[in-house]
From Swiss-Prot:
It comes from the Bacteria. Coiled coil: none annotated. One of its GO terms (molecular function) is protein homodimerization activity. It is an enzyme of class 6 (ligase). Keywords: Amino-acid biosynthesis, Arginine biosynthesis, ATP-binding, Cytoplasm, Ligase, Nucleotide-binding. Belongs to the argininosuccinate synthase family. Type 2 subfamily. GO terms for biological process: argininosuccinate metabolic process; L-arginine biosynthetic process; urea cycle. Pathway: Amino-acid biosynthesis; L-arginine biosynthesis; L-arginine from L-ornithine and carbamoyl phosphate: step 2/3. Homotetramer. This is Argininosuccinate synthase. It comes from Salmonella newport (strain SL254). L-aspartate binds at T131, N135, D136. It is found in: Cytoplasm. ATP binds at A17, F18, S19, G20, G21, L22, D23, T24, S25, A43, G129, T131, D136, D194.
Amino acid sequence: MTTILKHLPAGQRIGIAFSGGLDTSAALLWMRQKGAVPYAYTANLGQPDEDDYDAIPRRAMEYGAENARLIDCRKQLVAEGIAAIQCGAFHNTTGGLTYFNTTPLGRAVTGTMLVAAMKEDGVNIWGDGSTYKGNDIERFYRYGLLTNAELQIYKPWLDTDFIDELGGRHEMSEFMIACGFDYKMSVEKAYSTDSNMLGATHEAKDLEFLNSSVKIVNPIMGVKFWDESVKIPAEEVTVRFEQGHPVALNGKTFSDDVEMMLEANRIGGRHGLGMSDQIENRIIEAKSRGIYEAPGMALLHIAYERLLTGIHNEDTIEQYHSHGRQLGKLLYQGRWFDSQALMLRDGLQRWVASQITGEVTLELRRGNDYSILNTVSDNLTYKPERLTMEKGESVFSPDDRIGQLTMRNLDITDTREKLFGYAKAGLLTASSATGLPQVENLENKGK
């Protein structure tokens, strides 16, 4: 069976991930007119720039959908977001600022939950608005086929017939008007935005040029912290975790994780926390650039890692970072539910997150400027009395340290021998000043 359909399968049911925007509206109407039977599925991901979800399925029906469903994905999205925090599943960082993989998390949830809903309706052909140059086309492909092995893919933007007729936004708008729908194109921004409850991605158009900065972006989850005219008073916030799960903000407990994430977004968003500018490597190995917002994820991540460093030992923390980066890359590639990802997730959640219980107090200022004011946990292995510089009882004596340092003589001797061995091989040059071989000035190599 052919998995990807290059042309519209007339007479068959086609599920379309319907956002209500111009692209999917025109595609749905066009498919109906060409003889297909479109079913519209809209994911409620708590997008901060969407204020009326119920209106989206109604519009789909007006444009010719056989049926239209709104699928509430918020609970599952937040659950996956918390799992990513527990595992440190983030691999794109620049200058200490993190991209929290909010779009890949949204695709993992959308790609599985919408296809599951389609399967319930007997719809086994799926279309969405992803383009052939991006990451989403592969993410949706993987998650769709994982959920429904009989699934076939039809994307209008891969169909030359659709492209020839409605290849641009102007053509789509004219098509909608000609069909009796007063659909005007929205005012074109200098960039494109995609969002869900966990974060927002701003990319493309002017942001493809590296001389366009964050200053052209109008945040939808935070504030323009770079604008000195925007008043942002400092604010103290306390975050509490129990066994790796965020349960309270400023002393207020939450039985609903969705409400907790919304409050975390509000707190972090007041300061512009979690906004970053990243150059990343797409799945196809081409580089792209994005401006990201994730105020709630950033707030929880900072508090979580503060507790992590105070509770776990050095090697466990090293494995958390190493495995977290591996897992983050798998998540980015659309492999969040693959066996290798599940293996990493299980280890990190079972042996690392389960011990993260405690409370962290921070002072948030502008953007990513913050201070940690206090860290409290019954699980802390940080014990100031063990290494105090003041006179008092200690868990080891000066003689103990002398013995420990003496044991280092063996590897120091080995290292000296290696350095002189490298010098004999011509890899290092001797230094009259220190008596130790040194790396030769590369500019003089071979002269």
